[in-house]
Amino acid sequence: MKNILLLLLATFIISCNNTDSNFKIEKGVVGRINIETKIEQLDSIFSNDSIVKRIGEGDYVFSSSDKYLIFDKKKNHLLTIMPKQQHDPDETIETVQIFSKNFKTAKGVNIESSFIDISKNHKISNIQNTINNVIVFVDEIDAYFIIDKKNMDFKFQNETDRKIEIKDIPPKSKVKRFMIGWN
């Protein structure tokens, strides 16, 4: 009886650890996919989830890239995956957009994090100034975070030529998009 209880406890602990690894973000890895995952593998990797394929044909004929939207059984949007090359199931992944707060870095940063969470927990590699957003790059995890400039000082809001530094981004600025790029 004790052996059965120990076996059940061990199984429970292992399954809990596996669940966490299904949502971890680290360099070259997002949950169950990695930098070497091919598009043709997505159906088997996400066999318990739902995949919406927006391939560059039909309604999406003018789309510049194929998109694979991953939803869980409760219809929650988890990820959107874009391959390096359109129409090639043997191609690897170029970009992953994170939609679920369950996907986190080892330091707890997720789609619901604010800029202060990113800057305190990860080394910021670069900051790009675009028309409406700031793009914050974190090379140690292949990530970039898009943050809306609407909460920034007015002098940054409508200019793209101004250099933006860490101190210029309000700490409570929320992440608009959490992207992983594997170029």
What residue ranges belong to the model's regions?
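Short, structured protein-protein interaction patches enriched in aromatics and acidic/basic residues
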Residues: 135-139, 143-148
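Bacterial Sec-dependent N-terminal signal peptides
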Residues: 1-23
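Short helix/turn-capping signatures at newly exposed starts of structured segments
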Residues: 16-131, 140-141, 159-183
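Short, solvent-exposed loop/beta-turn-alpha elements that line the ligand-binding surface or hinge
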Residues: 154-155
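Charged, low-complexity, helix-prone segments enriched in Lys/Glu/Asp/Gln
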Residues: 95, 150-151
